From Swiss-Prot:
Source organism (scientific name): Vanderwaltozyma polyspora (strain ATCC 22028 / DSM 70294 / BCRC 21397 / CBS 2163 / NBRC 10782 / NRRL Y-8283 / UCD 57-17) (Kluyveromyces polysporus)
Gene symbol of the encoding locus: CHO2-2
Keyword Nucleotide-binding: no
Annotated protein name in UniProt: Phosphatidylethanolamine N-methyltransferase 2
Lumenal side: 1-58, 111-171, 220-254, 295-343, 394-418, 466-516
Top-rank taxon: Eukaryota
Alphabetized UniProt keyword annotations: Endoplasmic reticulum, Lipid biosynthesis, Lipid metabolism, Membrane, Methyltransferase, Phospholipid biosynthesis, Phospholipid metabolism, S-adenosyl-L-methionine, Transferase, Transmembrane, Transmembrane helix
Enzyme class name: transferase
Transmembrane segments: 59-79, 90-110, 172-192, 202-219, 255-271, 278-294, 344-364, 373-393, 419-439, 445-465, 517-537
Record's subcellular location: Endoplasmic reticulum membrane
Recorded GO MF terms: phosphatidylethanolamine N-methyltransferase activity
Topological domain spans for side Cytoplasmic: 80-89, 193-201, 272-277, 365-372, 440-444, 538-843
EC numbers on record: 2.1.1.17
Record Pfam families: PEMT (PF04191)
Catalytic activity entry: a 1,2-diacyl-sn-glycero-3-phosphoethanolamine + S-adenosyl-L-methionine = a 1,2-diacyl-sn-glycero-3-phospho-N-methylethanolamine + S-adenosyl-L-homocysteine + H(+)
C-alpha cells in the first residue's frame, strides 16, 4: 500500500475535528482540483473493513474481490494436489509478477495521467457515468456499484465527478492490491522448507519481529493518513486539512515505501530461500520506481518540492568557500560506487586512487592469508580512526590542527583541504581492506554460505551507502568533512540542520552508519574475524560520536536538545511513555530531596563558601534593585568600540561593599568562548587577567601591575585597571571583559563586546612599512637593535608577530623565515614588499 504524503513526511488529520469549547463537530471540506467545487467528503472505510467486515455494506465488485481472494487459496490447494508444490510455486510466482506490474505499472499509468490531465475525471464526465439521465450500461453499472457500496443516505448526484470516480478507482485498487498480497503469500507458502520451521532459529525470531513491525507501520500509517491519502485522493481532489507530523511518518522517509516493506524481508528470512528474497527485492524496487516516477512528481506539482530556503546552509558555506578562495576545489569523495569531485590537477586525488588500486592489485597478486588480511584490516581501522579522532579532538579543544598550518604560513583553507584528504583517505583505505577481507572470506567459505545471507548482507551494505548519501545530501561537503571543527568563522547562523535524514535521526551515522559492516559479518556466516571487525567499527564510531562530536556540537551550536522524529514517536508510545513518567517521578523525588538537604545545610552554615556562592548567584540573577545603581563596569569609549593593537584597554569598575571581595578579578575573553553562559565563566583566561586589589594578590605582581586606581569607602569599592601589552590578547576578534567574584568564576559584571584588531600597514613603501613595524614592536617591548625579540612581552611571540604581519599587510611570512633572518625588521620589510610586487605582477 502506498501513501502519497510520505514524501513530505506529513499526513492529513481526520475529517472530523471535535471542538472542545463548543461541543460541535466540524467536517473537513474538500474541493476539486480544476473546477474548485467545494464539498464535504463522505465517510469511507479502509480496505480490510470494506472487504471482510460483515456489518458493512458490500458492493458487487467488493464481493467479487473477496471471492477471488478465497478462490486463490482454494486454487492453490487443488493445484498443489494435482501438479505438486514446485509447479504451484511457479504458477503463483507468475501471478505475483502480473499483479505487481498491474500495481506499479497499471495504477502508475492511471495516476500519472490523472495527475497531469485528470484523465479519469474527464472520462467520467465525457461518458456521463454519474448523470441521472444516462442510459449507457457502463453508467448504470457505475452508479449501481457506488449506491451498493456507500451508505443509504449517500446521494452520488450531490457529489462532484472527482469524488465518485475516486470511489470506483478504489475498487480497482482493492482488487490489485489484495491479489498482489495474496499471490505473494501463496508463493512464499509454496517456498517454505519441507522439513518445517524451527521457531528457536534466530532467523525466525528476527523475521517475525520484522513482520510485526511492518504490520504496525501499515496500521499506524492508516491511522494517520486515513483513506484519503491511502487511496491517492489528492490525485482527484484536495482536502482543506492541516498538515501534521505523527507516528510512523516521524520514523523514516517514505515510510510506506521503505520500512513499509520490511515484512517482505522478514518473510524471506523465515523462508530461507534466496529466490523469495530476490523476488521481494524486485517488488520493492518496483515500488521505489512507482514513488520516483508517479508520486514524487505529483507531490512536487501539488505541494512543491522540499528545498532548503535557508541560504545559511552547509551547501551555501561550500559555495562561499569556493567563492572566497579561488584555489579551493571541492574535495574528493567516495560514494561507494564512484568518485565525486575528482581533480586531475590535485596530486592527493591521484595518490588516494592509486593507493586503493595498489592495495587491490597486491592482494590479487600475493593472495595473502585470511589471517594476514584480518590483521592488516583491523590495524588500518584502529590507526585511521585513532588518528582522525585525535585530530578532531585537539582541533575542537584548541584549534591545534589549524594552528600547525597557520604558524607555518599556510591558510585556514589550506589546512581544511589537507584534513579533507586525510579524512577521505582514512575512510576509503580501511573500507577497501574490509571489502578484500570479506571477499576472501566468502570465497573460502562459499559452499557453506547461503545465498540469503549474502543478499541480506548486501542489503545492509546498501543501507549504509544510502545513509551516507542522505547524510551528504543533508549536510553537504562542509558537514561531511566536519567543517565546523575548522571553519567556524564561516558559520553565520549556528543552527543544526533538521532536513533530510536528520529529520528522523539525530545521529544517523551512529545508527545506520555501521549497517554495512555488520552486513559483512552476515555474509561471512558470522565468522569471528568479521564480528571483531564489526565490533571495532561500531565501537570507534560510538566513541567518536559520544566523546568528540557531541561535545563539539554543544560548544558550537549550544546545548539545546533536538528531539528526532524517531524520538517523538517513541515518546508517543504508551508503554514507553509510562516508563519515562516513572523515571521522571524518581528524578523529581531525588531532586526535591537534594534541594531540601541543601537548604538544611545552608541554614546551619550561613557563612560557608557554598552559601556565599549561592548568595552571589542569587544576587546576579535577581539583579537586586537596591544594589544595582552602585554597580558600574565601563570601558574607555572608542569609536565603533574598536581597539587597534597595541593600544591599552582602560576599565573602570565599581561595586557595593556588600558584594566586593579582595580576591575579585577581571579577565579578558573572546565572546565566542563565553557565549554559552553569561553568569559563570567556563573557559580559562589563559593569563589575560588582573586582580582588583593588590591586597588580594600580594604575591602576584604580574597580575596586579594593571591596577591603576583603587578606592574604598563604607558604601562602594571602585577602581581602574589598564590592560596593556602585558595582558592584552594579540589576536583579532570580538572580546569582552568580565568581573569575577572571590577568586572564582562567578561573573558579577561583563562589558559590552568590543573588537580588537591589528593595525593596517602600508606595504607599497619599504621605509614606511619598516617604520610602522618598529613603532608597533617598541610599544609592545619586543624590539632590540632593530630586530624582533620574544622576551619583551609575554603574549607577543613569534607566532603572534607572524599573525600581525599577515593581518596588517595581507602577506604571509612563516615563522621559519622570521627565525631564519633572526627577526631583522629591514629584511622582513624588504621581503614583504618583494612578495607584494611579485603577486601584483601575476595579476
Amino acid at each position: 500500500m502506498s501513501v502519497n504524503y510520505s514524501e513530505t513526511i506529513c499526513s492529513f488529520q481526520d475529517t472530523a475535528i471535535n471542538n472542545i469549547g463548543t461541543g460541535k463537530k466540524y467536517q473537513t471540506m474538500a474541493h476539486t482540483r480544476s473546477s474548485n467545487i467545494r464539498f464535504v467528503p463522505a465517510v469511507t472505510h479502509d480496505m480490510v473493513r470494506s472487504l471482510f467486515d460483515p456489518t458493512i455494506k458490500k458492493s458487487f465488485l467488493e464481493c467479487c474481490i473477496t471471492l477471488s481472494i478465497f478462490a486463490n487459496f482454494g486454487l492453490c490447494y487443488l493445484f498443489n494436489l494435482k501438479f505438486g508444490q514446485s509447479l504451484t510455486k511457479v504458477f503463483y510466482l507468475f501471478q505475483y509478477i502480473l499483479w505487481r506490474l498491474s500495481y506499479n505499472l497499471g495504477i502508475g499509468i492511471l495516476l500519472h495521467y490523472q495527475s497531469k490531465n485528470e484523465s479519469l475525471t474527464s472520462f467520467a464526465k465525457l461518458n456521463k457515468l454519474f448523470d441521472k439521465k444516462s442510459t449507457s450500461k457502463l453508467a448504470k453499472f457505475c452508479q449501481f456499484e457506488i449506491s451498493t457500496k456507500m451508505a443509504n443516505d449517500y446521494n452520488m448526484h450531490n457529489y462532484p465527478e472527482e469524488f465518485n470516480i475516486w470511489l470506483l478507482f478504489r475498487q480497482f485498487v482493492d482488487l490489485i492490491l489484495m491479489q498482489d498480497f495474496t499471490t505473494y503469500i501463496l508463493f512464499v507458502y509454496c517456498s517454505l522448507p519441507s522439513e518445517g520451521i524451527d521457531f528457536k532459529n534466530w532467523r525466525i525470531l528476527v523475521g517475525t519481529s520484522m513482520i510485526l513491525f511492518n504490520i504496525w507501520v501499515k496500521v499506524d500509517a492508516h491511522r494517520v493518513v486515513k483513506d484519503y491519502a491511502w487511496y491517492w485522493g489528492d490525485f482527484f481532489f484536495l482536502q482543506d486539512s492541516e498538515l501534521t507530523f505523527d507516528g510512523v511518518f516521524n520514523i523514516s522517509p517514505h515510510p510506506m515505501y521503505s520500512i513499509g516493506y520490511l515484512g517482505y524481508y522478514g518473510i524471506s528470512l523465515i523462508c530461507g530461500d534466496y529466490k523469495v528474497l530476490l523476488i521481494s527485492i524486485w517488488g520493492h524496487i518496483l515500488q521505489f520506481l512507482f514513488l520516483k516516477y508517479v508520486e514524487n512528481p505529483h507531490i512536487e506539482e501539488i505541494y512543491g518540492s522540499e528545498s532548503d530556503t535557508n541560504q545559511l546552509s552547509n551547501s551555501y558555506i561550500d559555495d562561499l568557500i569556493v567563492k572566497e578562495n579561488y584555489d579551493y576545489s571541492r574535495p574528493l569523495i567516495s560514494t561507494g560506487l564512484r568518485w565525486k569531485h575528482y581533480d586531475l590537477l590535485r596530486f592527493s586525488d591521484h595518490f588516494t586512487i592509486l593507493s586503493i588500486l595498489a592495495v587491490v592489485l597486491i592482494a590479487i597478486k600475493t593472495k595473502p592469508t585470511e589471517k594476514a588480511l584480518f590483521i592488516i584490516t583491523i590495524t588500518a581501522k584502529i590507526f585511521s580512526a585513532s588518528f582522525t579522532s585525535y585530530i578532531l579532538f585537539k582541533q575542537s579543544k584548541d584549534k591545534w590542527f589549524t594552528k600547525i598550518f597557520l604558524k607555518n604560513g599556510y591558510t585556514q583553507i589550506y589546512c581544511y583541504q589537507q584534513w579533507q584528504f586525510i579524512y577521505n583517505y582514512s575512510f576509503v583505505l580501511p573500507t577497501t581492506l574490509l571489502i578484500l577481507q570479506t571477499t576472501s572470506k566468502i570465497y573460502n567459505l562459499y559452499p557453506n554460505i547461503e545465498y540469503t545471507q549474502i543478499i541480506f548482507g548486501g542489503i545492509l551494505c546498501a543501507i549504509q551507502m544510502w545513509c551516507n548519501s542522505e547524510i551528504r545530501a543533508a549536510i553537504s561537503d562542509f558537514g561531511w568533512f566536519y567543517g565546523d571543527f575548522f571553519l567556524i568563522n564561516y558559520i553565520s547562523e549556528r543552527r543544526l540542520t533538521s532536513q533530510g535524514i536528520y529529520r528522523y535521526l539525530n545521529n544517523p551515522e551512529a545508527i545506520l552508519g555501521t549497517a554495512g559492516i555488520w552486513g559483512t559479518a552476515l555474509m561471512t556466516n558470522f565468522c569471528y574475524e568479521n564480528i571483531i571487525l564489526a565490533i571495532i567499527w561500531t565501537s570507534t564510531n560510538f566513541i567518536f560520536v559520544k566523546f568528540i562530536e557531541k561535545p563539539h556540537v554543544s560548544k558550537i551550536y549550544g546545548n539545546e536538545t533536538r528531539i528526532s522524529g524517531v524520538g517523538k514517536t517513541l515518546q508517543g508510545l504508551k508503554p514507553l511513555r509510562m516508563i519515562y513518567d516513572i523515571f521522571d517521578d524518581i528524578g523529581s523525588l531525588f531532586l526535591r530531596n537534594l534541594i531540601a538537604s541543601n537548604k538544611h545545610a545552608l541554614n546551619h552554615s550561613a557563612a560557608s563558601p557554598l552559601h556565599l556562592e549561592f548568595s552571589i548567584q542569587e544576587a546576579l540573577e535577581n539583579a537586586n534593585a537596591k544594589l544595582a545603581p552602585n554597580c558600574k563596569f565601563n570601558l574607555e569609549p572608542k569609536p565603533n568600540d574598536e581597539y587597534v593593537l597595541p593600544e591599552s584597554i582602560k576599565i573602570s569598575w565599581q561595586l557595593p561593599i556588600e558584594l566586593y571581595n579582595n580576591r575579585d578579578w577581571i579577565g579578558l575573553y573572546n565572546v565566542l568562548d563565553t557565549r554559552t553562559n553569561r553568569y559563570r565563566t567556563k573557559v580559562s583566561s589563559s593569563g589575560h587577567w588582573c586582580g582588583t586589589s593588590r591586597e588580594g594578590y600580594k604575591s602576584d605582581k604580574q597580575n596586579t601591575m594593571a591596577i591603576k586606581e583603587f578606592h574604598k569607602n563604607s558604601k562602594v569599592v571602585k577602581g581602574v585597571v589598564v590592560f596593556d601589552y602585558n595582558l592584552l590578547i594579540f589576536e583579532p576578534g570580538i572580546y569582552e571583559v568580565r568581573y569575577h567574584s572571590n577568586g572564582g568564576h562567578n561573573v558579577i559584571m561583563s562589558s559590552q563586546p568590543f573588537q580588537i584588531k591589528f593595525p593596517k600597514f602600508e606595504i607599497t613603501d619599504q621605509e614606511i612599512l619598516h617604520s610602522n613595524l618598529v613603532n608597533f614592536l617598541t610599544k609592545v617591548n619586543s624590539i632590540n637593535d632593530g630586530k624582533f625579540v620574544e622576551n619583551g612581552s609575554k603574549y607577543f611571540n613569534t607566532r603572534t608577530f607572524s599573525c600581525l604581519l599577515k593581518k596588517s599587510t595581507g602577506i604571509d611570512i612563516s615563522i621559519e623565515f622570521i627565525k631564519k633572518v633572526s627577526g631583522d625588521l629591514k629584511i622582513i620589510s624588504h621581503r614583504l614588499c618583494e612578495i607584494k610586487k611579485i603577486l601584483d605582477s601575476l595579476d
